[in-house]
Swiss-Prot record:
It holds the Pfam family DUF758. Interacts with FBXW5; TNFAIP8L1 competes with TSC2 to bind FBXW5 increasing TSC2 stability by preventing its ubiquitination. High expression detected in most carcinoma cell lines, especially in cells transformed with virus genomes. This is Tumor necrosis factor alpha-induced protein 8-like protein 1.
């Protein structure tokens, strides 16, 4: 029995094409201004923390690739009911996590890196479960790389610490997250 499917082939081609195009120019076309500002600040904070432009670019590129592939899966109706339910849980958890991150920034002495790290790792696990068989091992590795960096307690401590330039990066990230929460785009 031949299991060839044009729809499946087209989806694979789109994923492959998008994985090659995950650059800042493509992000500018596909991402709204607020999201772009948040991603730019996240890139700057990551570059500052890792002291590596290459590592910061890799992390952001992986984030964009995963987001684009997730969008393709949704647009192509590739996810089943259980997977969509997991994705709704992921979105709800990510939204709650964004509110927590903003709150930690706004209210002095409330920051707890363990809370943010645990929430980020929970989001990672939900995303893995939701997209399980639809993405390659390499894409799952990208998910691990992005969430591993974001949940790094040392990175979170630096980001929420009093020192510049992290304080400025965090302020701009939280301002953007606040706008995204208000607009309902997160």
């Amino acid at each position: 029995m031949d299991t060839f499917s044009t729809k499946s082939l087209a989806l694979q081609a789109q994923k492959k094409l998008l994985s090659k195009m995950a650059s800042k120019a493509v992000v500018a076309v596909l991402v709204d201004d607020t999201s772009s500002e948040v991603l730019d600040e996240l890139y700057r904070a990551t570059r500052e923390f890792t002291r590596s432009r290459k590592e910061a670019q890799k992390m952001l590129k992986n984030l964009v690739k995963v987001a684009l592939k997730l969008g393709l899966l949704l647009r192509g109706d590739q996810l089943g009911g259980e997977e969509l339910a997991l994705l709704r849980r992921f979105r709800h958890r990510a939204r709650c996590l964004a509110m927590t991150a903003v709150s930690f920034h706004q209210v002095d002495f409330t920051f707890d890196r363990r809370v943010l790290a645990a929430g980020l790792l929970e989001c990672r696990d939900l995303l893995h479960q939701a997209v399980g068989p639809h993405l390659t091992a390499k894409s799952h590795g990208r998910i691990n790389h992005v969430f591993g960096h974001l949940a790094d307690c040392d990175f979170l401590a630096a980001l929420y610490g009093p020192a510049e330039p992290y304080r400025s990066h965090l302020r701009r990230i939280c301002e953007g997250l606040g706008r995204m929460l208000d607009e309902g785009s997160l």
